[in-house]
């Protein structure tokens, strides 16, 4: 089980990430200059209506959007962890998954956020960070 505080703690380790609060949903988002890597994502009325039409419901708890490396990666994450990650029609064709923080393991959250950050970080910054952490 993870929390927004875990997201803050994990992303604080990544260079050039800032947290912003606000936007159209009023929640927090974590970004680099290249864009968001993660964001709080409450349901919109249209999400609830579309899910209801599909016979599905929005899960309880805090939901976090996390960027992934394209549609193939998205499909793999959704298939591998169906109780943790989900998607909605609004995200069709968009490289991100929705994450149930109340069920995700903190280590898996760290891996997903690291991968998302690597997609958004400058290549030289990412390479230096990977080397510093023994991952390169």
Protein language model regions, located:
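Charge-dense, helix-prone N-terminal extensions
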Residues: 1-136
């Amino acid at each position: 089980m993870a929390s927004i505080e875990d997201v803050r703690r994990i992303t604080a380790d990544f260079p050039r990430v800032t947290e912003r609060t606000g936007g159209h949903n009023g929640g927090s988002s974590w970004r680099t200059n290249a864009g968001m890597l993660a964001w709080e994502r409450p349901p919109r009325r249209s999400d609830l209506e579309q899910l209801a039409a599909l016979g599905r419901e929005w899960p309880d708890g805090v939901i976090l959007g996390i960027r992934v490396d394209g549609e193939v990666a998205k499909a793999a994450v959704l298939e591998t962890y169906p109780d943790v990650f989900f998607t909605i029609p609004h995200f069709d064709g968009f490289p991100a998954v929705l994450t149930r923080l109340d069920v995700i393991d903190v280590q898996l959250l760290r891996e997903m956020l690291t991968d998302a950050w690597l997609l958004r970080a400058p290549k030289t910054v990412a390479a230096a960070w990977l080397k510093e952490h023994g991952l390169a």
